[in-house]
Amino acid sequence: MDLIELQDIRKTYRLGEIDVPVLRGISLKVSPGDFVALMGTSGSGKTTLMNILGCLDRPTSGHYRFDGQDVVDLTPDQRAALRNRKIGFVFQNFNLLPRMSAVENVMMPLSYAGGGVSDQNGRERAGALLTRMGLGEHLDNEPSQLSGGQQQRVAIARALINNPSLLFADEPTGNLDSATSEEVLRVFQRLNEEEGVTIILVTHDPSVAQCARRIVRIRDGVIEPESGAVGDMPQVSKAAPAQSKPVHSAMRRGDLDKFRRSLHTALSSLRRNVLRAALTTLGIIIGVAAVIAMMEIGRGSSTAIQRTIASMGAHTLALLPGTAASGGVSFGGGSVMTMTPQDSEAIVNECPAVLAAAPIVRARTQVVHGSRNWVPAGIYGTTPTFLEIREWPLAEGDVFTERDVRNASKVCVLGQRLVDELFQGENPIGLEVRIKNVAFKVIGVLSPKGANMMGMDQDDLLLAPWTAIKYRVTGSSLANVNQSAASTSSASITDQVNSLSNLYPTEKVVLYPEISTTQAFDTPLPVRFTNVDQILVGIRSTSGTRAAIRQIGEVLRERHRLRPGEPDDFSVRDMTEMTKTLASTATMMTKLLLAVALISLIVGGVGIMNIMMVSVTERTREIGLRMAVGARAKNILQQFLFEAVLLCFLGGAVGILVGRGISHLVTVLLNWPTELSLDAILAAVGVSATVGIVFGYYPAWKASRLDPIVALRYE
């Protein structure tokens, strides 16, 4: 059976509206083991015929059978597979890839073999072929380190790596001197005579054609009658014709080998223009760095806001007294004193959603120690529960107790700002401060909290038992229950303060005793007995905020004897709403910054697309060579897409490092809170890959659509 059989092959190119015939009814047969010289002048059609014979092109009409298979109607991928398994090419210009060693150039067709071989087996086969070509000492040399003859022998070894049935040599001596040309021709003769390789040598030089056993002349697209075999050629040996050997399953390479080769090819491409690659990835680096830095700064800020809110009491509600009005004029919140310590106890006992509650009495006056004085932002009379609700630990010392509250003990706990202003480095524990000339012993110092969301210094305060502040500092007393009671009372304020122990008997502690209906009726609301300025409520969870507000409202309305339809004589401030608002604002700002960063990533992606388009143009000949040795369109697409993704990954990796560095510098230099964001890093990696795929696809697709013939001729 003939290896090649052509019947009436015609090829016509259309230039505008004109049809230009190049091949005019070519019929030809080539037997296995034959050595044919296809000779003709420039423009005779010999190169077009070789391209059709080598499955690089398709005829306009006619029939072509290769090794018994009709190849005219094969798809491009099927023709590529046929070229890879059964056809080898040797070109006039060698077409070796400059950044690859001799062994790597020879191994290139193995990358596209259907079965594939491992890197180790492929290297051994390539090394053996190069040794047969007399290049055993130049395996790792790049083409620039080899002579012209040596480069052509590397090209021959590459053509033989997959044991092809047919070897095409297109003007193989065109760029060589006479001595080297004879050396290369002897290699072809030896391959044909000793190994039975079928060779078609394309040339215009009669002296080169003489090395073949058969000369086929072509003129103006028509084959001239053959003159017979070359008479002075030695007899062909009895070696069996070369057969395309299938690759055994034991030699199959895995995905890891494919990945390694693709990675090596991509890195070799990037090494050609390191500076250009670095500048190309600059947009990706800036975008990823911005994403990382903004996410970490945003997350740190969000955490800081949450901590600030927590320090103010994220799980807290503030209950304020009602509003008095006269003549249509409102006197503002707290103008009617409707809250009592008893309300605080009732809320804790009767509201399941409430964890704790603390009454608060406020005072505004100066605090004196020695010759120094300071007016703190807040002087709060409360209970020890206040610090539990606020989750506020002590830096040193102790907090006052419920016994201190019962006894109106003159003890206090200071905030850090007040300590700094009054004691200036001196340890305040055990010392005294005076509030309205009442001496209070300092028993504890609060840990610093800093400013709250409104910018107020939370450390500028003094805490003491509410009974001490109310009865010893602000001047409220039992005598002031009402004016008439005061006029008939003979006890002084001091005596009544000292009689507080009678209100809190040690046998059975009733911190806030009930008052009778008569007392409640006779006592004007603005000065109701044991009224407080505020009640701080700690709820069990933010999800139970609405339930807590509803329960508190029901309890207080019942206690204050409010009829249905009457307005509340109290108000509730919900910190969770402020928390949600601030969190929403922080999230919005983070998204805005991320949008800016994503724009930078898009700009970087456009840069990737641009550089990949340039790379496709620069490597057009390489693409044609890879297609000639068996690369399918999807192989070219995958390779260039891999390079684009690798470029983005490298830019992303550098961007992650830069972003982390920026985040660290912001923390060190500006003292802004930042927090490591693994989500941002993973997102940056994902975005980098996505940018590489999206913006690298078109250049890769364009590369895969190149015509191998046009690509090989590209200058």
Swiss-Prot record:
Residue spans crossing the bilayer: 277-297, 592-612, 639-659, 681-701
Subcellular location, record wording: Cell inner membrane
Domain ABC transporter residues, every copy: 4-245
GO MF assignments: ATP binding; ATP hydrolysis activity; transmembrane transporter activity
Keyword Hydrolase: no
Family matches, as PROSITE patterns: ABC_TRANSPORTER_1 (PS00211), ABC_TRANSPORTER_2 (PS50893), MACB (PS51267)
Domain of life: Bacteria
Topology class, membrane: Multi-pass membrane protein
Xref: Gene3D superfamilies: P-loop containing nucleotide triphosphate hydrolases
Keyword Transmembrane helix belongs to the record: yes
Keywords: Antibiotic resistance, ATP-binding, Cell inner membrane, Cell membrane, Membrane, Nucleotide-binding, Translocase, Transmembrane, Transmembrane helix, Transport
GO cellular component: plasma membrane
Top-level enzyme category: translocase
Binding site for ATP: G40, T41, S42, G43, S44, G45, K46, T47
One GO biological process term: response to antibiotic
Family affiliation: Belongs to the ABC transporter superfamily. Macrolide exporter (TC 3.A.1.122) family.
Entry-linked PANTHER family: ABC TRANSPORTER PERMEASE YTRF, MEMBRANE COMPONENT OF TRANSPORTER-RELATED
Name of the molecule in the record: Macrolide export ATP-binding/permease protein MacB
Species of the source: Syntrophobacter fumaroxidans (strain DSM 10017 / MPOB)
Name of the gene: macB
